[in-house]
Each structure stands twice: as C-alpha cells, then as structure tokens.
Amino acid sequence: MMATAGAVAATVMTPEQARAQALARVDYPANRLANIADLEVNEPMDIAYPDADSPGVLLKFGQAVEGGVGPDGDIVAFSVLCPHKGWLMSYSPTDKTLNCPGHHSRFDCEVGGQQIWGHATSNLAQFLLRVDDQGDIHAEGVDELIYGRLSNVL
C-alpha cells in the first residue's frame, strides 16, 4: 500500500479585504440624437454613438418593442456594425431587421437586436436611450460590445 500525504492551505482575509470591489465602468456621453418629431414609423435615421466612429441607426416602430423608449415604448437604436466582422449593415423595413452583406447575419430590431440568422455570435449592440420632457432622444450607454472595440460595455 502506498501512503499519501497532503496539506491544506487557507487564506485568512479581513472583512475589508473580503468586500466586493466594483469593476471598472465605461462612462458614456449623454448625446442628443434627435427629437421624437423627427422620426417617422419604420424609417431609419442614421446616427453615431458614442462617437463619430460608431455608426448606428435610430428607429421608431409605432408599437412597443423590447428596449423601446418614448411615450409608446417604440424607439430603439443599434450599432450598424455587424458583430461578426464589422461590415456596415442595412435596414430592411419589410421585416424590420438589420442585415449584413458580408456573411448574411440578420438581426431583429423589434427584439433587442437579437441575431436570427448568420455567422455572428452575439446580438447587436443596442444603444441605451432616454427621452426628455421636450421629446429629445438621448443615448446614454451601450449594452453589447461594439465591433472593433475592446471595452465599451457597462
């Protein structure tokens, strides 16, 4: 028979050391994108957020959608850079999707930019919006990684 010996090690921490530490956060600018009056149902408006190197689209659907803001909960905004390879996508008003010409990924704009087809491995980056009392639409954050960036999520 073989005998084995083992040792157990323990680390003792003070309560201060054991407290959860906040992770680093990305601070986003609160950019005004448009006014509700500027939007037409199912007509995309080109925007950029959080900076000029991040193209996006602002959409009004006329009925409440996932992540929608405004009086009807029908206004959303997304990055138009495909999360697969960064191709610039176009909006299809027929099926309310953003479509990539590169490898044919498709994303449902009524369901939070959820991927419905193609090679992408994540949903679209959705811009977090707020509507003020004057109807101005402000972007204040991003909920997914924008293609080509290493850290832009909250």
Model regions and ranges:
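N-terminal export signals
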Residues: 1-21
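N-terminal pre-ligand scaffold of iron-sulfur
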Residues: 14-95, 125-154
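Short, solvent-exposed loop/turn motifs
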Residues: 53-55, 106, 115
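A short, acidic/glycine-rich surface segment
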Residues: 65-68, 111-115
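Short loop/turn microsegments at loop-to-beta-strand junctions
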Residues: 73, 103-104
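Iron-sulfur (Fe-S) cluster-binding segments and ferredoxin-like electron-carrier domains
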Residues: 89-94, 106-113
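Short cysteine/histidine-rich metal-coordination sites, predominantly Zn2+-binding motifs
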Residues: 96-103, 114-124
